[in-house]
Amino acid sequence: MILQKGDLLGFVDESSQNINSNTQRLWSFAKLKIKKNTIHLKANTIGCFMLNGIDTISFPIRTKSEDFCEFLVEVRQNNPVGRICLLADNFATHKAKRVREKANELNIILIYLPPYSPDLNPIEYLWKSIKRIISISEIDTREELIKTARDGFFSLTASLSAARMWIPRFLYDKLDLLC
């Protein structure tokens, strides 16, 4: 069994926050005036949504294996006690030898989801919600973009809403291990 009593369980993934990804949709019979931000701002994001630990978010310039290793160190610093089990997709960075070695050194177990199954990772729902928040915000600088993404991330992770359906579906008899 992978999950043991006292383990911390989290979900990790990258996303690119962009002020031009508008996720708002609506029907209207009247002619609407569309407000569009023409500034091109982007922030790479790595996030770790913990079910029973401290969440972590980072905004690296790149998302290469070195950057992901640094992020794993941050996750460990935020969660210094116990083994950490992280669910990750099959992004090449997550499977890099350097990343696997660093995870092993930090007592972090990386559990890879099946290919083409982003719906199994609750953090994907967080990214979608954060992009929605960004799309309706007036943002003029990269710092504002990062602040909006960070605030949205911690607000959403505090409620566990992204994992509400995941927990009973996949953890049913293991939930007591996380307490």
Identify the function of each model-found stretch.
Residues 68, 94-97:
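Short, well-ordered alpha-helical microsegments
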Residues 6-7, 123-179:
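C-terminal anion-handling pockets and recognition modules
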Residues 13, 82-94, 121:
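Acidic/histidine-rich, metal-coordinating catalytic segments
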Residues 98-107:
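Catalytic-core regions built around general acid/base machinery
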Residues 32-39, 106-122:
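RNase H-like polynucleotidyl transferase catalytic core
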Residues 1-73:
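Extended, low-complexity cationic-aromatic segments
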Residues 88-90, 111-133:
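RNase H-like two-metal-ion nuclease catalytic core shared by retroviral integrases
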